[in-house]
UniProtKB/Swiss-Prot annotation:
Pfam family for this entry, one: ABC_tran
Natural source organism: Francisella tularensis subsp. holarctica (strain OSU18)
ABC transporter domain mapped to chain residues: 6-230
Name assigned to this protein: Lipoprotein-releasing system ATP-binding protein LolD
Gene name linked to the record: lolD
Entry GO terms, CC: plasma membrane
Binding-site residues for ATP, renumbered to this chain: G42, L43, S44, G45, S46, G47, K48, T49
Entry's localization field: Cell inner membrane
Length: 231
C-alpha cells in the first residue's frame, strides 16, 4: 500500500523581474508519508514559504510535478485544486488569521462550512470535539481578542484539524510565540500527529524545535537538502 500523502518531483519556481529570471526553487524533490513529521529550515528569503505554497496548491510551480494522495495536483483546474486541498490538507500560519468577530468555535467551524457536508449541529459537535483535543473547549465562546497568543494558535490548529486532513502544512507556526509557548505548541502538534496519523510539514527557523521531527530538511539557495532522517 502506498503511504505517500504528499510529494513533489523536480519542482522549480522562478519569477521574472525586469526581464530577469529569479530562481526561487531549483529541482526540489520531497516525499511526505502518512504520519510523518517533517521540518524545513532555511534563512529568510530562502524559498520556504514558496515551497509550502506550491505543495499546498496555493501557488503553481514553473516546472516539475506535485502529487496529493497519489493524484497529480499541480496541473488541476483552480476549482479541482481547491476541492483536493480542502479535503486532504490543513494550514497553520505564523499569524493565526482568526476572524476577530467570530468566537473560537465559530472560527473552527469555517472549514466545515466550506465543505458543505455538515449540518450546523454536526459542525458544532465536531468543532467542540477538536477544541477539546487542543485543550480549549472551555474557551469555545471567547473571541480572539479574549485569548492569549498561545490560545489563538491552538484555535488555528483546531481549525486546521477539524476536517480530518491527511497532512497539515505549517508556516512558522510558533514564530510569534515565546519559547515556552512554542514548546507547548510543538508538543501539541506532535501528539496530534501521533494520535490521528496526520502528517505535518513545518517551516521553521527554530533548529531546537525542528530536531523533534522525523526528518529535517534545509533549503539553501532554492535547493532542498536532507539533513536528518530519524525514521
Amino acid at each position: 500500500m502506498n503511504d505517500v500523502v504528499l510529494s513533489c518531483k523536480n519542482v522549480s519556481k522562478k519569477y521574472t523581474e525586469f526581464k530577469t529570471d529569479i530562481a526561487i526553487l531549483k529541482d526540489v524533490n520531497l516525499e511526505i508519508k502518512k504520519g510523518e513529521k517533517v521540518a524545513i529550515l532555511g534563512l529568510s528569503g530562502s524559498g520556504k514559504t514558496t515551497l509550502l505554497n506550491v505543495l499546498g496548491g496555493l501557488d503553481k510551480c514553473s516546472a516539475g510535478e506535485v502529487y496529493l494522495m497519489g493524484e497529480r495536483f499541480d496541473n488541476q483546474s483552480v476549482n479541482k485544486r481547491a476541492k483536493m486541498r480542502n479535503k486532504h490538507l490543513g494550514f497553520i500560519y505564523q499569524l493565526h488569521h482568526l476572524l476577530p468577530e467570530f468566537t473560537a468555535i465559530e472560527n473552527v467551524m469555517i472549514p466545515l462550512a466550506i465543505t458543505k457536508k455538515y449540518t450546523k449541529k454536526e459542525s458544532i459537535k465536531l468543532a467542540n470535539e477538536i477544541l477539546k483535543k487542543v485543550g480549549l473547549d472551555h474557551r469555545a465562546d471567547h473571541k480572539p481578542a479574549e485569548l492569549s497568543g498561545g490560545e489563538r494558535q491552538r484555535v488555528a490548529i483546531a481549525r486546521a484539524l477539524v476536517t480530518n486532513p491527511n497532512c497539515i502544512l505549517a508556516d512558522e507556526p510558533t514564530g510569534n510565540l515565546d519559547s515556552q509557548r512554542s514548546e507547548s505548541i510543538f508538543a501539541l502538534m506532535q501528539q496530534l500527529s501521533d494520535d490521528f496519523g496526520i502528517s505535518f510539514v513545518i517551516v521553521t527557523h527554530d533548529e531546537k524545535l525542528a530536531s523533534r521531527m522525523n526528518k529535517i530538511y534545509r533549503l539553501v539557495d532554492g535547493e532542498l537538502e536532507l539533513v536528518i532522517n530519524s525514521n
